Amino acid sequence: MLDPTSERDLFDQENMEEISQLASLEMSGDVVANTNSTVVLEKPSYPDSVYVTAANIFQGIRIQRSPDKVIINYGSEPLQPSSSRSEDESFQRLSYELAFSTLKYQDILESILIDSYIFSSTTIASQLNSLIIVMLYDFQDRKFQPRILSENEETIPEVQEVENLLNGFKTKLAAALARCRIKHDALSIYHILPETVRKQEQRASTLPLYAWINTSKISLEEVYNNLRRKGYSKVKSITSVNEKVYAVDQHCFNVLIFPAHLKTDLLNIDLIKDYKLIFQDKSRSLAVHSVKALINIDDDVLMVNTGSWYTVAHMSILTSGHTSKIFVCGIQQEEKDFNARKLFTRMGCQNIEILHETFLSIESKDHRLQNVKVILLLPRCSSLGVSNPVEFILNEHEDKSLLQDLSQGGLPKDKLETLVQQQFEQLTHAMKFTKVQAIVYCTCSVSKEENEDVVEKALEYQSSGVKMQPYRLSPPVLPLCTLKEIELSMDRFFRLEPSDMNNGCFLSILTRERDPSETVSVKDVLARAAAKGLLEGVEVGKTLKRDKKRKKSKALPSRAPHHGDPLRDHLAVDGNDTSNVQMKISELLHRESKISTSTKMSAPAKTVSQAGTSSQVRKPSKPLSTPLVRNFSRPVERPTNFVRARPEGKVIPLKPIEIVLPPVIFPLSSQGPRVQMPATHFYYRFIGSKVGVPRYLTSSTSRRKEKVKESTTSSHVRHPRPWL
């Protein structure tokens, strides 16, 4: 029988082996391959200042319970953070990531603390409870290994006190953790999380980095060359995560994609430091590129709820070659105004106008916005399509209170309804601007209530408003690169579902129906084409001048055509000058009648002595009433000149149509007119046709020819019909 000391040592050893064997003590959820191994890879530890800042963040976003269900009292006084690095961006990101991870496991960590009797065994101030739970998460994530600090690292007394407490209860905490895992029948505490949260973590671990190129400071080719010199290779798609590669996005020409593991390396290159390459979520680039496709070179844009200043800068840079202005509203604090203008100057943005009013307080007839043609609306949303909420909320300056709901996999119904109402109010207010022609509505949510329902409700609501041309739903202006994207856009909405390659995104374009009384000028068409880059090397001003000259030339009398082709000659004649055309036709037919008469007198004798019945056809005593017979009898008189000038006026209705018809379906009877057809017709009338395959004219063509002939002075004048 073992003594109490040996029994305690054996219990400690068994617990430590279980801790080292199970990946439940890792948040990745993977089981250790070798269950007998006790080798544990060290994970970098956080400095004291990160723990304190993360504890204060957790204190503000933690899930608060009703008084009868309170497990741990967290106090109300925040800890004093270190002021040396509190404003550092990387420091803030580490603190928020630690606080958000703790928030996801709040229920589990609280159960472990209660089950280990740590609070009943010690007396510790309640204001340190937030620090305890944050450090416990990191402690078990590192498999209860001691933290290693650098020599010059600043130490905080409260952090040292809590660390000593957790090390003293290491065995009991490990045992409580194992019991919690067994209770939920889970391989790890990671599998206790809701499925939506687990999928979110999996996507976040592989989500690539998106960065757009600031073309006001550097060209695309210069960026490619710079990256190549630093060892990066350009590929078509990001498939390998272990190499220094990048790809160009298919939807946005100035957006590059990098594997996630390259972020630390990229942050140290000059392209990032000099604002030539900007990290930002792809959804924001999709929004600004949609606006770019809708505006002319002199149209202004109004941006609402932009969040990050990078979105405003991106819109400004895409329109840097235009005379457009980019209006951004809602910057009310002077400090934010100063920081925003400073950033815009560094990035080379020159066409941004800041409005201090909120969007809903701006009148639709504001004189400053009379040239605004497109509104970009990025409303506050639930961000349920985002895989890494911390990264997105910090970069886009979104509401940090959303982290509490996103840690549990979704928003409560009442919060979602509040967001939907705000989105509807902003969209309907945007529709009131009379000069605006299009609205781009973009969210990072996958909730139908925030996307399709809001847009459709706003479209229905507009009918009861002011009498203006209504808005309608327009198809996406972005390229659809895959079959799945095409299927998702069948209802005229652009969607990206959350995946390992991108966050979720919803984008809708509303365009005002064109007033039927208004006509689109050439200037507008050319301006739109120039804005889309379709007129490279062509100056719009010169094009407009050429167009004016063409209009003047049309007003002058039509000149004689010089093409030698009847159809092109007809197109060169003004269709309104009917009298001039008729006069030319009469002159031409009169001239050809003389030529035809002289030709008839000089015809060879052998032509007359053809078939016996052919001479009857040429008797001018009485013209045949059948148009087909008359048309076919006329070619016997072979014209002497095939390059004679051709008539202009009524040529277009007489455009020949060649149809090969078998003799058995000839429209006339088998006797009579067909017997009278001259045999010579098949040899010299249609040069180049195959022998034995005659070509006939349709009856409609013959009737048209007869009408032209009847307009002449003589009924038996036979001209060679040069247009056939």
From Swiss-Prot:
EC number(s) for this protein? Answer: 2.1.1.-
Q: Where is the composition biased (Polar residues)?
A: 595-618
PROSITE patterns per the record?
Answer: SAM_MT_RSMB_NOP
Query: Which GO-annotated molecular functions does the record name?
Result: methyltransferase activity; RNA binding
Segments passing through the bilayer: none
Task: Enumerate composition-biased segments (Basic and acidic residues).
Answer: 562-572
Query: Which keywords, in A-to-Z order, does the entry hold?
Result: Methyltransferase, RNA-binding, S-adenosyl-L-methionine, Transferase
Task: Write the protein's name.
Answer: Putative methyltransferase NSUN7
Give me the gene this protein comes from. Answer: Nsun7
